[in-house]
């Protein structure tokens, strides 16, 4: 929004031209989202406490989590508000990339909000019925997938980039829709499964978003894209604003979500942030790279799949409890140790993912 004002004022004072640079606006976007979260966080937490919107803890969960019962939840609204305000202020609102991610954040955030509402207000520990949640996620993801396929403006927008291989970028054709669907829905649910300990999900989300900010900048720059053998995506640079807004809002939220948490993000945060990461990966054509950099999310999801599959097929469980972070809790690891070690793994995987841009 302020881009247009700065563009108008540039004719009177050339210094306003600095707002035309994506990097400058990205820094402002990060700072805006961060400061908003830090400023509004205590007010939101107090409001949630007043409304008695507290975390519902299942009786079959780890005993150490019983003390978390009643901790304010739905803090993901703070993250979403920070991202939306920051992007609307500093982003180029003529960019379809920006609106696609905002739509995904809003739609999946609404699904998560309904789920949280049923849990904390109506006291239904199961929340939104699983089939309805999956149906709503599928509708939103398919809508985006079809739109991106129909509105593709260059061949690079529907290619699959394969890490470690320089010129292997096959055209996907109609399979593009299938890939987009599974990337968005899968990423959304993976982050949701990871959000089980204080700060466990938000820090890897911040790391992956920061990495995608760099990738989006490179993909939107014709010379860097050519040098690194990435598909050149005109206008993708505006995704940098979205990514840094997620980083800023996420760090601000972590201030209150770090152990012991004062607030949880709830499904309104985890479902929307996961879907946003999947959408950004799709837009910059790095779905495979998301699997690498978001390895912690993948690990958590696979642990659940293996646990359920093993129990149904063999009647035996592989882990003491799934997702896998609960397995380590039941082994006696203190919660902060599990969290920080998963953060370290996430940092390593993000750096590995970025290294693949050059290792071709």
Swiss-Prot record:
A GO biological process held by the record: regulation of cell shape
Cytoplasm found in the keyword field: no
Metabolic or biological pathway, per its Swiss-Prot or TrEMBL entry: Cell wall biogenesis; peptidoglycan biosynthesis
Record PROSITE patterns: MRAY_1 (PS01347), MRAY_2 (PS01348)
Keyword Transferase: yes
Highest taxon of source: Bacteria
EC primary class: transferase
Membrane-crossing residue ranges in chain numbering: 26-46, 73-93, 97-117, 132-152, 168-188, 199-219, 236-256, 263-283, 288-308, 338-358
Subcellular location: Cell inner membrane
Any GO molecular function: phospho-N-acetylmuramoyl-pentapeptide-transferase activity
Protein's membrane topology: Multi-pass membrane protein
HAMAP family found in the cross-reference section: MraY
Protein name, as recorded: Phospho-N-acetylmuramoyl-pentapeptide-transferase
Organism: Shewanella halifaxensis (strain HAW-EB4)
Gene symbol of the encoding locus: mraY
